Design a protein with these regions (language model features):
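Initiator methionine at the very start of the polypeptide chain
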Residues: 1, 29-30
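Beta-rich carbohydrate-recognition modules and glycan-binding surfaces
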Residues: 30-236
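Bacterial N-terminal signal peptides
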Residues: 14-24
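Bacterial N-terminal signal peptides that target proteins for export
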Residues: 2-16
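Intrinsically disordered, low-complexity segments enriched in Ser/Pro/Gly/Ala and basic residues
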Residues: 2-5, 23, 220, 224
């Protein structure tokens, strides 16, 4: 009798487990998967595209050279943006064409340099899910670091390194979780660490090259092409 009752109980338990599994699978199958590109539940929403920039070759006479294609405001196509250069020899950064895009190249610089963009309409909130998306190429062992200029005027560099090993790649930079350091705007050298900087009020955003360029050919340098910033605007 006990064996029979035990067998009946085991059979009922197995049936209930099987039924629960079947119900779970059916419910999961009926739950629609999130559409590609939509936000997953519980995650902070991605900010919208605040600005984008596709650089251009500046006006010049004759064939393109290192001298007549140097970066000025004329390389910027977005009328809402200003380009800023930092470093003793940053003025020799030039525009060039690769893969049918225009990029900025630091190969001829004899000093560290930084390139940033400033939105004339608003400050930038780079907290949370804000992202900088940039098509970049680093050559040899050259690396890039994210740079921000705060509303209080301080230029900061992040400890996150960017390297693409000679390929043009679309790189996304998240600004949270980084350690930040004061960046000397004249020499582009790293100073003291800044703890918890206010990334809710950023004036400029860009990248720094903490070593000089290596010249033409397969040498240490970086190319900076199309760029997009996904962030919330902050009134100036």
């Amino acid at each position: 009798m006990r064996n029979t009752a035990s067998a009946r109980l085991t059979g009922r338990t197995g049936f209930m487990v099987a039924a629960l599994v079947a119900w779970s699978l059916t419910a999961a199958a009926q739950t629609p998967a999130p559409a590609p590109g939509t936000q997953k539940p519980g995650m902070a929403p991605r900010p919208p595209l605040l600005f984008g920039e596709t650089f251009r070759i500046p006006p010049h006479t004759g064939e393109e050279t290192d001298e007549n294609t140097r970066v000025t405001q004329a390389v910027v196509t977005n009328s809402n943006l200003e380009i800023k250069l930092y470093g003793a020899d940053a003025s020799v950064i030039r525009a060039a064409t690769h893969e049918q895009r225009t990029d900025l190249w630091n190969g001829m610089t004899t000093s560290p340099a930084a390139v940033t963009l400033r939105d004339k309409r608003s400050l930038l909130d780079l907290t949370g899910a804000a992202r900088l998306r940039w098509i970049l190429r680093t050559n040899a062992i050259h690396t890039l670091h994210p740079v921000v200029k705060l509303a209080d005027g301080r230029l900061l560099v992040g400890d996150r390194t960017i390297t693409t090993q000679g390929e043009f790649l679309s790189v996304e930079v998240a600004f949270i979780g980084m350690r930040w350091y004061v960046l000397d705007p004249a020499k582009v050298v790293v100073r003291a660490e800044v703890v918890n900087p206010n990334l809710r009020a950023v004036d400029e955003v860009g990248v720094a090259m903490l070593m000089p360029g290596g010249g033409h050919g397969i040498a240490g340098s970086a190319n900076m092409s199309n760029v997009e910033l996904f962030a919330y605007p902050v009134p100036r």
